Structures are given as C-alpha cells and as structure tokens.
C-alpha cells in the first residue's frame, strides 16, 4: 500500500507535468506565407469571444498600427536608462504596406475563438541560416483591438540541426517582453479584464488614413 510520502510525491510530479504541458494557441489556417510576411489564424485554448469576423480596411489597419511604438521591457537599473529615450516605432512604412492588407484579410476570416498571428521577415546576419523576425498577434473584441508583440527584430534561425543539443544556435529565441505605447495615448486603455487595448473605433473617427498606391502593397 503506498505511503503518504509516495502519494504526495506522485501528486507533485503530476502537477509539474501538467504545468509544463500547458496548452498554447495553435494554428488552424495559413492565410499567407511569403518571403516578407506570414499570416495565420490561431485557435485560442480558452474562451475568447472575439468580435470576429471584423471588418477593417487595410488603410484603417495601417492608421492603427502607425500609432504604436515599443520598447523592450528592462529590469532595474537598466530600466532607468531605457526610459531616458523615447520608444521606437513598431512598424516602418514599408512594413505597414505589407502587413496591413494581410491583417485586414485575417480579421475578416477569423472566427470568434481565433486570433490573427503575423510575422514580418527581413534578411538576417547570415542570410542562408537566419532571418530577422517581428511577430505577434491581433484580435478585436467589442470596441477594443488587442495587439501583442512576441518578437521584435529578433534573429531567428531558418534551418534546424539538432534540437537536442543544448547550445544549438538553430533553436529559436524565447519571445521577448515589451512595453507598447500608442499615440494619442487617450485611446490606449486598460479594459475591464485588466488587459491593455486600443479603443480603435473612437481613434479611427479622426485618424488620417493613407491609401496605398497600386503596386505598393506587395508582400
């Protein structure tokens, strides 16, 4: 008959296994895969109740994303030095021309439990082995648009050699921790659930819209 210590040990191991195997959103549909960008739909594992499909035009998406800036989240004392300079723009104009139409399509095709995941690619330090990636996801719920950034100009390997070698340079880096900002700041709010979100409908009422010229927005 198992002792009390054995039962406690088994329960502890089971809890660690369950924690280590936490479910993550998973890909359901690839909407676009190219040299400069990729956009996929991801299924949430917890009820999300997004307002998808959402009707947003590419110029509206561009205006929204143009307002975001970003800074890597630092621990003290590095945070003091980081806060002395303004955050960087999240997207350059050429990136907006690529990603805005794809995100507009993604939001129109996503379901209520799906988010739209995006990746932007640029050549890495060694073009044959790595590329620079900016990635994250967007979703809409009611009056709010949610944006999360996972990688910001991160060097990510293209090829995988031996995933079991602990110092293998081909393993992708862990997602980063970032602070997002938006201008005008009055639209970047804390919603009822405690998450940062953009009151995008209110913002779009007075936002300047830039319509891409034909042939500009080629991924």
Regions found by a protein language model. Give the residues of each.
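Bacterial Sec signal peptide processing site at the extreme N-terminus
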Residues: 15-39
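Short acidic/polar, Gly/Pro-enriched loop/turn segments located at secondary-structure boundaries
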Residues: 53-57
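Extracellular/lumenal regions of secretory-pathway proteins
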Residues: 76-105
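Acidic/histidine-rich, surface-exposed loop or edge segments in extracytoplasmic proteins
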Residues: 37-48, 60-87
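Mid-length scaffold segments of soluble, non-membrane domains
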Residues: 96-132, 136-142
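Polybasic, proline/glycine-rich intrinsically disordered low-complexity segments
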Residues: 154-218
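A mature extracytoplasmic/lumenal domain signature
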Residues: 120-124, 134-136, 144, 149-153, ...
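Sec-dependent bacterial lipoprotein signal peptides
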Residues: 1-19
């Amino acid at each position: 008959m198992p002792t009390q210590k054995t039962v406690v040990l088994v329960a502890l191991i089971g809890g660690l296994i369950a924690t280590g195997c936490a479910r993550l959103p998973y890909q359901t549909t690839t909407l676009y895969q190219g040299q400069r960008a990729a956009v996929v739909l991801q299924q949430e594992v917890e009820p999300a109740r997004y307002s998808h499909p959402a009707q947003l035009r590419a110029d509206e998406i561009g205006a929204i994303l143009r307002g975001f800036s970003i800074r890597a989240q630092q621990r003290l004392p590095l945070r003091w030095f980081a806060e002395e300079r303004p955050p960087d723009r999240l997207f350059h104009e050429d990136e907006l021309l690529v990603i805005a139409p794809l995100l507009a399509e993604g939001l129109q095709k996503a379901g209520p439990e799906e988010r739209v995941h995006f990746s932007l690619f640029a050549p890495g330090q060694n073009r044959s082995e790595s590329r620079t990636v900016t990635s994250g996801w967007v979703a809409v719920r009611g009056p709010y648009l949610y944006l999360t950034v996972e990688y910001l100009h991160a060097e990510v390997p293209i090829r995988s050699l031996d995933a079991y070698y602990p110092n293998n340079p081909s393993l992708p880096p862990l997602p980063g921790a970032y602070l997002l900002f938006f201008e005008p700041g009055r639209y970047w709010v804390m919603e009822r659930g405690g998450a940062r979100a953009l009151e995008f409908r209110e913002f779009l009422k007075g936002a300047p819209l830039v319509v891409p010229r034909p042939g500009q927005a080629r991924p």
